[in-house]
A protein has these predicted regions:
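Rossmann-like NAD(P)-binding element
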Residues: 45-48, 63-122, 129-130
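Hot-dog-fold acyl-thioester-processing enzymes
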Residues: 337-400, 456-476
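Active-site-proximal catalytic alpha-helix in oxidoreductases
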Residues: 28, 153-162, 178, 187-213, ...
């Protein structure tokens, strides 16, 4: 995970990223690299490439920091280059995200390899081509791998890696540092893993519309109100394992396996994409979502993704588990100061307001002020020794009184810092005073918190254990 100076390096050199092709996926890569603290060079021949990338960046800056409980590294530097040669010169990772035409990609690789370092990773975002196809006629074939992400790249963590074992392992390490989930595909196959599954659902959806069984809205509703929610946190096979009951997966297959012989799907057939069918789909889609601009839909999507992934963090499950790991690394890189003297405030928390915390008034809901202050207390207590290990021994602190004063609005994307002072430490009693400030140093809220040390077995208050008592005594 990169620090404020972006930690992953080759030797002592900070990694540099290049992006060739700045469309939806390429722009997403640019945002992911920049917001994780790395410098990026971009080449794109489209006259509006700069505008489109900046629009993607605007969405990413608004949503990506809200995934985490700590601030992200200082944003890297973005440079638009007039040629491939200039963009890839000195790059450690080159992301190719140009149109899905094999001949164009191979021509691009020839120019890239003529100017990039020989040990650089050339990672194609292709959703369908195999590495062996991309590598044909390349001067250094193994240098080219597939790193297939999902839109929006700055939020969704999955990247499918296909190619040389040594290169993909190295790529996986870099992607993990970027907060992504690299999935190394065991053998190359057209469309890799995820897109083969998506293609099956897409084909069936086209038939349902073609045959007049369902509209675009009804198909989307079947996904987002049903199995889509299950898939988002358990995938397909884990979901079916539950369906098998106590007898497990084998029972599920025995029970539902015969259904595979029934005419439930048309997976090997595709309806002819006639003008009539295309117009039908487009018209239904316009009725469903035409009231929103694409930019509005992107922001709705991003807000929902942030909210869902943050919910998964609570149970440390799926994508939430990955985000919690990233938070631990970010926390280690921004270790808070701890008080030396009674009443002296120290910074206990730095974070960004996620869009999912904003209510109907357009600002952070009051319930989340308490959440931020609670996190600040946890950080301070952990620094004094009352951490998870201490809790596992059967001791902790309970809040028995808390007062918050709301002094200024906090909006989505605002960077907040909490400064905490211990104002009383007598036996089992602990009092804290918090101040929440925004990036301009304005005090947004204050909080007075009274805690009691508790024995978790008896559920009654008691004096702190010797290590904690000694740490508190040093503050007197």
């Amino acid at each position: 995970m990169p620090s404020n100076a972006a930690s992953h390096s080759s030797g002592n050199k900070k990694l540099h990223f290049a992006v060739i092709g700045g469309g939806v996926i390429g722009g997403g890569w640019v945002a992911r690299f920049l917001l994780m603290g790395y410098d990026v060079s971009v080449f794109d021949t489209a006259p509006d490439a700069r505008r489109k990338i900046n629009e993607v960046l605007e969405n990413a800056r608004r949503s990506m920091p809200g995934l985490y409980e700590h601030v992200l590294p200082k944003e890297g530097r973005l440079v638009f280059c007039p040629s491939i040669a200039e963009a890839v010169r000195g790059a450690d990772w080159i992301s190719e995200s140009i149109p899905e035409r094999l001949d164009i990609k191979q021509l691009a690789y020839a120019e890239i390899q003529a100017h990039c370092p020989e040990n650089a990773i050339i990672a194609s975002s292709t959703s369908g081509f195999k590495p062996s196809e991309l590598q044909k006629n390349a001067s250094t074939p193994k240098q080219i791998i597939v790193a297939h992400p999902f839109n929006p790249v700055y939020l969704l963590p999955l990247v499918e890696l296909v190619g040389d074992a040594q290169k993909t392992e190295h790529a996986a390490n870099i992607l993990s540092d970027l907060g992504m989930y690299p999935l190394i595909v065991r053998k190359e196959i057209d469309a890799h893993i995820a897109d083969r599954l998506l293609e099956a659902v897409w084909r069936e959806g086209l038939w349902l519309i073609n045959d007049g069984v369902a509209t675009t809205r009804e198909i989307d509703d079947a996904i987002r109100y049903g199995f889509g929610l299950r898939w988002a946190q358990m995938g397909m096979f884990e979901t079916y394992r539950i369906a098998g009951g106590e007898a497990g997966m084998a029972h599920f297959i025995q029970q539902f396996g015969p259904a595979l012989e029934w005419p439930w799907t048309k997976l090997m057939d595709v309806p002819a994409l006639t003008d009539e069918l295309v117009d039908k789909i487009a018209s239904q889609s316009d009725q469903q979502s035409g009231q929103y601009s694409i930019r509005a839909l992107e922001r709705i999507r991003d807000d929902n993704l942030v909210g869902m992934m943050r919910a998964l963090k609570v149970k440390d499950w799926g994508a939430g588990n990955l985000l919690n790991q990233i938070d631990q690394t970010l926390s280690a890189e921004t270790d808070p100061e701890y008080p030396i003297n009674m009443g002296v405030p120290c910074c206990t928390t730095r974070r960004v307001v996620p869009s999912s915390w904003v209510d109907y008034n357009g600002h952070m809901n009051d319930s989340h002020y308490g959440e931020v202050f609670s996190k600040a207390s946890d950080v301070l207590l952990a620094g004094m020794g009352a951490d998870q290990d201490y809790v596992s021994q059967g001791y902790s602190y309970f809040t028995v009184d808390l007062h918050i004063s709301y002094l200024a609005e906090c909006l989505a994307g605002d960077e907040l810092a909490v400064f905490t002072a211990i104002t009383l430490a007598e036996g089992k009693k602990l009092k804290l005073a918090h101040e929440m400030k925004n990036a301009e140093g304005e005090i947004c809220a204050t909080c007075s918190q009274f805690l009691l040390h508790v024995d978790l077995n008896t559920r009654k208050s008691c004096p702190p254990r010797p290590p904690i008592a000694a740490a508190l005594a040093r503050l007197q």
